[in-house]
Amino acid sequence: MLLTTPFVSSPVRVQGNGGSGASPWAGAATALRIQAAKQLTGRVVTTKADKTVGVEVVRLAPHPKYKRRERIKKKYQAHDPDNQFKVGDVVELRRSRPISKTKHFLAVPLPPRDTRRKSQLLPPLQSQSQSQDQDQPPTPPPSSD
């Protein structure tokens, strides 16, 4: 029997016990593999150490009892070889080989987000352009003296 789930990239074959009544999902727990995140995004909170930045990563997780999503913050140490980041910068953490006891990520700059507002990206509405025309005083025609 094949087990398909959105959490596994390929179907997993599960050995059933024929008609014994055992659940086909019983052996699936051992066949699934959980992988750690390869890249995270966070904000630099400290730059005191040389070639190291402290990055705070915020994620949403459900509360065990109340099921309401809550913010969970975790701080990672990341390698910054050029000391280029400042406190408040948003960086991407990429998993790498262990650099020290606590550093397992490399800090990479993110491209700046587009700061233009939606109103600047879209053309004005027809009603907005007419109201702007009415607000402007009429310009006198050029005199031909």
From Swiss-Prot:
Protein's cellular compartments: Plastid, Chloroplast
Keyword Cell inner membrane: no
Coarse class of the protein's main subcellular location: plastid
Domain of life: Eukaryota
UniProt keyword terms in alphabetical order: Chloroplast, Plastid, Ribonucleoprotein, Ribosomal protein, RNA-binding, rRNA-binding, Transit peptide
InterPro entries, sorted: NA-bd_OB-fold, Ribosomal_uS17, Ribosomal_uS17_bact/chlr
Compositionally biased residues, Low complexity: 120-136
Pfam family, one: Ribosomal_S17
Chain positions covered by the region annotation Disordered: 101-145
Residues annotated as transit peptide in the record: 1-36
A single MF term (Gene Ontology): rRNA binding
PANTHER family linked: 40S RIBOSOMAL PROTEIN S11 FAMILY MEMBER, SMALL RIBOSOMAL SUBUNIT PROTEIN US17C
Function in brief: One of the primary rRNA binding proteins, it binds specifically to the 5'-end of 16S ribosomal RNA.
NCBIfam families, sorted: PRK05610.1 (NF004123)
Family, as annotated: Belongs to the universal ribosomal protein uS17 family.
Subunit structure: Part of the 30S ribosomal subunit.
The protein's name: Small ribosomal subunit protein uS17c
Species, as recorded: Oryza sativa subsp. japonica
Gene name of the record: RPS17
